[in-house]
């Protein structure tokens, strides 16, 4: 990267020379980095350098971002997937490191378990915007600590001992939940700055409206326009460029299940906005009808009944569907109807990539003989002013096309684990962006048993969609659910059977499965800090935590033998091995 200096320039010419050198190096960075090969920026390297400070800062998260890119591109090339889940705490993230190659930090989990105000709640993104970055830092510090601890332990071993001790890569890249960016462009750049500083290798941002944000599997989702979300992506990328980092950007769309959209300003959204088709409602917008009903004293179920009656009368449809119905009703030959329908579909069909505005589509409809069509997208607007939106995979594809040049990974949120939806979205997006990486939420909000999959199909779901290009797949809340399941079942058992429940369900299981928290003092770093104290005090310490007398010696084993515990359980005997 460019030359930075905390020393003030000695002259205007030196100031300009530094600036130009930094611009050249920034452009060279973009040109030489594979991550940016397909990235579209509406700004220049000169714009970026103008927004930077004079003192260069380096970020550990940048190395993790490069590692994440290599990991995901390898999976993409092999048609496999990095599979992971939402980590709640340092215990989970250290256990996950043994088996998984990326880590997810969920806004839902943070909202319910770890906000910076300590006030829990549902996933509405109404917590302070440093909540998820703080959780990222919590986990990233833990990753670095366990890495340091392992290095000290391994370098205290002989070469033979190290050869028999598996090396664990604790530094697994973290992808974090950026929700909607938490407001306008300035909020998004500040959020992204926090993520880089706290250790995130990647960040995802979704296309819901910030003020009405919902969990992707709740009702009532309101989309922003395509253009507004593109601006969020650009703002995030700009902040990463200012900081000189290669943090991965994931664009998420909730367009499959969304029912509302903030505005009709973007032509790319027009084909999915619903309008009233009943001319008898002309001059009777829903918002006015509801306002009069409220003024007359109606509320609750009575008010809902008024809305339901109006919506039934309105007969909401897409403009395209109205045109198709109109062509079918024309007093022309069937052959001519077929020709006009074909022309309409050819020029408006999403599969061709054509995106007509409502006004262009209306002009085309008139050329095809549909001139007196009643269709009004303003009449059914909600009291908040939102337009009615018909969510679909097609809508998600159109958004994927728009987001692709500005993001590294595209994620379509879905309402069920549907292989057909996965295939259609992948093929649709890749028709314009063949090299784009895709992500998939293996959501615990799905009732997987209700999906009618066999156990074998569930087992193969991840590799099946990986072959379609979904190279990063994650269970958002698995850490939360695993934590709840273990604690609920253990607490119930402990209340009934006391210490036998702990020994049988926890301690022996840790032994048999080689879980390193069995020796929790060692896991927490007591040996590491003993070594640090000895280093400070010339190699000895009378107050070493792991010296003679520590109860953890009861679990100790040597490299040449294993400790076996023999316990009667009913009529049986269990041999358990402790691996420290």
Swiss-Prot record:
The keyword Transcription regulation does not apply. It is found in: Glyoxysome. It catalyses: D-threo-isocitrate = glyoxylate + succinate. A motif (Microbody targeting signal) lies at residues 578-580. Its EC number is 4.1.3.1. One of its GO terms (biological process) is glyoxylate cycle. GO terms for molecular function: isocitrate lyase activity; metal ion binding. Substrate binds at residues 106-108, 216-217, 252, 441-445, 476. The active site is at 215 (proton acceptor). GO terms for cellular component: glyoxysome. Its main location: other. Its cofactor is Mg(2+). Coiled coil: none annotated. Pfam families: ICL (PF00463). Mg(2+) binds at residue 177. Homotetramer. Involved in storage lipid mobilization during the growth of higher plant seedling. Belongs to the isocitrate lyase/PEP mutase superfamily. Isocitrate lyase family. This is Isocitrate lyase. The lineage of its organism: Eukaryota, Viridiplantae, Streptophyta, Embryophyta, Tracheophyta. The gene is ICL 8.
